[in-house]
């Protein structure tokens, strides 16, 4: 079947008149007139070519009509989305799989999914029922109606039906709209061809002549702006000083008599040392120093020699009675706590040693 377009029809023309005119060259299946143009469907292609050759610019009711093959757009198809496709699958294999349910207009594989355009909607529904969640080349594929609004019509060889914006006249790689739906920025492409684009000079912060104007516009957000560390520290120190002045201003300034007069001055040297007052003569000081040195350095510091004097000799044993207790008590007072521990431990050792006698 071939569809012919008839243009520039006169108002007096009727469908019966147009049908009888084209039946001279072949069988007419359908004839429709829409205002000043119409369509005629001829069964044979050769008959359609003869009708075009003989009836183009044919004068009908004083008007030359135009007869040519119809250049209508592609038939509306049903677009299917096929997911989870094997990486080894080809377009021919996938097309053959879907042609089992009806004519396939186009089949395109994109990575692990594909789009299949079927000519009839009822065939697409049958393909979904028969192929969804089925094994194909070792993987379970998912078939469903495509929800993409762009590129619903088949045809990828010409500059028609851009994937991104849906307009005609360019491919998707040349589309000014990016993948997010915004107009793309061609600054980089322009810079490569014509050099870098100079941006206008903008004045820096505070360079305006009216910036420091005391009677300028009010800054309503000044209280919310972040201040520098130095300003915050200075404000904190000032507030602390003012608080001390307000709270302690009514208290009298009392100077304690116990504090020496040389410590009340503000110029006190913490490293200044003062000699103790001389309470006696030089002879007294020398005697005190000699006593201190004799009591500390003159004493025998060896615990072994001190314990040897206190412990009883071998074979004498331990005595009992008040005299022995007093001697042990006097020895304990002469020794330190460390010496007492050593003495008791050595006494226990000696006791075990002389227990057989």
Swiss-Prot record:
Pfam families in the cross-refs: RRM_1, zf-CCHC
CDD domains, sorted: RRM1_RBM4, RRM2_RBM4
Any Gene Ontology CC annotation: nucleoplasm
Induction: Accumulates according to a circadian rhythm in the SCN.
MF-aspect GO terms: RNA binding; zinc ion binding
Region (Interaction with TNPO3): 196-357
Domain of life (superkingdom): Eukaryota
Alphabetically ordered keywords of this record: Activator, Metal-binding, mRNA processing, mRNA splicing, Nucleus, Repeat, RNA-binding, Zinc, Zinc-finger
Zinc finger (CCHC-type): 160-177
SUBUNIT field: Interacts with TNPO3, which may mediate nuclear import of the protein.
Protein name per the record: RNA-binding protein 4B
Organism: Mus musculus
Gene: Rbm4b
């Amino acid at each position: 079947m071939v569809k012919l377009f008839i243009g520039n029809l006169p108002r007096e023309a009727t469908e019966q008149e147009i049908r009888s005119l084209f039946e001279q060259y072949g069988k007419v299946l359908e004839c429709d007139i829409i205002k000043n143009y119409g369509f005629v469907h001829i069964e044979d292609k050769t008959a359609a070519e003869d009708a075009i050759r003989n009836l183009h610019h044919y004068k009908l009711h004083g008007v030359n009509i135009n007869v040519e093959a119809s250049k209508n757009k592609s038939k509306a198809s049903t677009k299917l989305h096929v997911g989870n496709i094997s990486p080894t699958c080809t377009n021919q294999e996938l097309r053959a799989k879907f042609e089992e349910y009806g004519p396939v207009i186009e089949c395109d594989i994109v990575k692990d999914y594909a789009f299949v355009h079927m000519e009839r909607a009822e065939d697409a529904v049958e393909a979904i029922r028969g192929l969804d969640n089925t094994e194909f080349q070792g993987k379970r594929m998912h078939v469903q109606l495509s929800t993409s609004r762009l590129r619903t019509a088949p045809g990828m060889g010409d500059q028609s039906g851009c994937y991104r914006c849906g307009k005609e006249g360019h491919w998707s790689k040349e589309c000014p709209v990016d993948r997010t739906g915004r107009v793309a920025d061609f600054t980089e492409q322009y810079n490569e061809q014509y050099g870098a684009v100079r941006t206008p000079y903008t004045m820096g912060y505070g360079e305006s002549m009216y910036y420091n104007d005391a009677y300028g516009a009010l800054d309503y957000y000044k209280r919310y702006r972040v201040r520098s560390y130095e300003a915050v520290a200075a404000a904190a120190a000032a507030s602390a000083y003012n608080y001390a002045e307000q709270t302690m201003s009514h208290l009298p300034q009392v100077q304690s008599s116990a504090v020496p007069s040389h410590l009340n001055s503000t110029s006190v040297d913490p490293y200044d040392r003062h000699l103790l007052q001389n309470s006696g003569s030089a002879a007294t000081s020398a005697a005190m120093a000699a006593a201190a040195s004799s009591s500390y350095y003159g004493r025998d510091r060896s615990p072994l020699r001190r314990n040897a004097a206190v412990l009883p000799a071998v074979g004498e044993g331990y005595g009992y009675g008040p005299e022995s207790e007093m001697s042990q008590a006097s020895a304990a007072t002469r020794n330190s706590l460390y010496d007492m521990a050593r003495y008791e431990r050595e006494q226990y050792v000696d006791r075990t040693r002389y227990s057989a006698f």
